[in-house]
A protein has these predicted regions:
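A cross-kingdom feature strongest in bacterial/archaeal respiratory oxidoreductases
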Residues: 1-186
Length: 186
């Protein structure tokens, strides 16, 4: 609220209550789903523009499709491989993309794909993730705690403009001391 002198005031108790609510819905060890807007097709209004479909994601280099991005650690734990299909809750199937740097217990899926009647010859491109957004307290968050996954034993090839030179089996970050480097430069 606002004080009489015009200065904005915040209730610290309300902030603590909000943080406690977020922690209570996170589910601890459960998987979380993060839905995001794709850089090229946005919400999907322009999904029928092939120029936008051809524009690869700046991080994954995937174009013409969306996918479920998972961390290498989660992929290993769930025995998932690149381009294997999975279902998230009852959504999908959607191909997996193992993404270094992805948060461990988080799956990310881009919105804006799977739109019907957009002038695309075969009908759709990708999967529409909009049905996954659940209304809570009148809002529609793009974060869903406590999701489940189910493997579909089928592979699906993603269109990528580059699939080499990403990590080449190395750790995400490498650090050393001068002494270690001089002893073993590899």
């Amino acid at each position: 609220g606002q004080r009489e002198d015009g200065i904005q005031a915040y209730d610290a108790g309300a902030v603590e209550a909000a943080l406690a609510q977020v922690k209570s819905t996170s589910g601890g060890d459960s998987l979380e789903l993060a839905l995001y807007t794709n850089v090229s097709v946005g919400s999907g209004k322009q999904a029928n523009n092939p120029w936008l479909q051809e524009l690869p994601d700046p991080v994954t280099k995937v174009c013409w499709d969306n996918y479920a991005a998972v961390s290498p650690k989660l992929a290993e734990e769930l025995e998932l491989e690149d381009e294997q299909l999975i279902k998230i809750n009852d959504f999908g199937p959607i191909p997996v993309l193992v993404q270094p740097g992805q948060e461990y217990k988080t799956i990310s899926v881009a919105l804006g794909y799977g739109r019907l009647n957009m002038g695309i010859p075969d009908g759709t491109v990708g999967q529409t993730a909009f049905p996954l957004i659940q209304s809570t307290s009148g809002t529609k968050p793009n974060h869903l705690p406590q999701v489940t996954t189910e493997k579909v034993d089928v592979a699906y090839q993603l269109a990528r403009t580059q699939s080499h030179h990403s990590m080449e089996g190395r750790n995400l970050g490498r650090e050393t001391t001068l002494e270690q480097y001089l002893a073993d430069p590899a």
